[in-house]
Amino acid sequence: MLDKSKRYLVVGLGLLGGKYALELSKAGFHVDGINRSEGHLQYALEHGYIAGGKTHDFEALVAQADHIIFGLYPTALIDWFRTYGSLLKPGCIFTDVSGVKTGLVEPVQALCPAGVEFIASHPMAGRETSSVEHAAEVNFAPANFIITPTEKNTPAGIQWARELAEVLGFKHICTLTVQEHDRMIGYVSQLCHAIAVSLMCANDNSSLCEYTGDSFRDLTRIARINDKMWAELFLWNKQNLISEIDQFDSALQEMRAALVADDRDKLEQMFRLSTQRRAAFDKKLPE
């Protein structure tokens, strides 16, 4: 069980940072916040997400925090830590919410002061909208929480991350290496966003919205996207994503070839395979 006497600090009160702050506060933890936007900080204060917070002159909040949640983009997290990381006190264990770990975990762990531990994690939840105003809409219960420990992490740090996920409401918690995580994310998350975005960009006929059905809406739900965040995540994980795009393109070309050849058997074979794999996937979904 997490110690409720510990002070938590959320740096970056966006969608996920705001949700962490909300759930921790609801669970009875003392949570402070740091945010660049005064408006979003005030929203978090007024709605009880945080007990206190600042947009600047926040060194004291950092120094007294027992645990920190970084709701920042990877580049911003590294930059922030280079400036303020020395303020973290011995015994502080902190984590992030970033969707990419390669290029982030090793540099931040190398910058940690003595006695400070960074245990990286990824809450695989979110919405098409962003900002703390929509944080309450995020549902952690059906989502996956992935912990990505390295040889520099302690059993206590890993256990803290697991217990944090439980307090936040995650039902499925697992561990992967940094490399495994980024390979997996390239397929199950980033490729899906790449397909949705490409589908929306492939046709500019705005009148199509009058005729679309559920299939189009389902496939393009995630195409309404945070451009700055996803551009950064794509570029940070570009080798894995390019590999997945190539593999997807190969499958699409296989279907195209079947159409050109009027190969009904091949099309039916692909449809059966996708149906079988989707059925198996549905059985494995966490309840």
Could you describe each region identified by the protein language model?
Residues 207-277:
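Interdomain hinge/lid region at the active-site interface
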Residues 58-88, 92-93:
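Rossmann-like NAD(P)-binding element
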Residues 137-222:
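Internal alpha-helical scaffold of NAD(P)-dependent oxidoreductase catalytic cores
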Residues 7, 30-32, 117, 144, ...:
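Residues at the starts of beta-strands that form the adenosine-phosphate
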Residues 80-133:
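Rossmann-like NAD(P)(H) cofactor-binding subdomain of soluble oxidoreductases
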Residues 4-7, 91, 142:
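Phosphate-coordination loops involved in phosphoryl transfer and adenosine-cofactor binding
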Residues 1-62, 67:
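NAD(P)+-binding Rossmann beta1-loop-alpha1 motif at the extreme N-terminus of oxidoreductases
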Residues 36, 72-73, 97:
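Short beta->alpha hinge that forms the Motif I/post-I loop of the SAM-binding pocket
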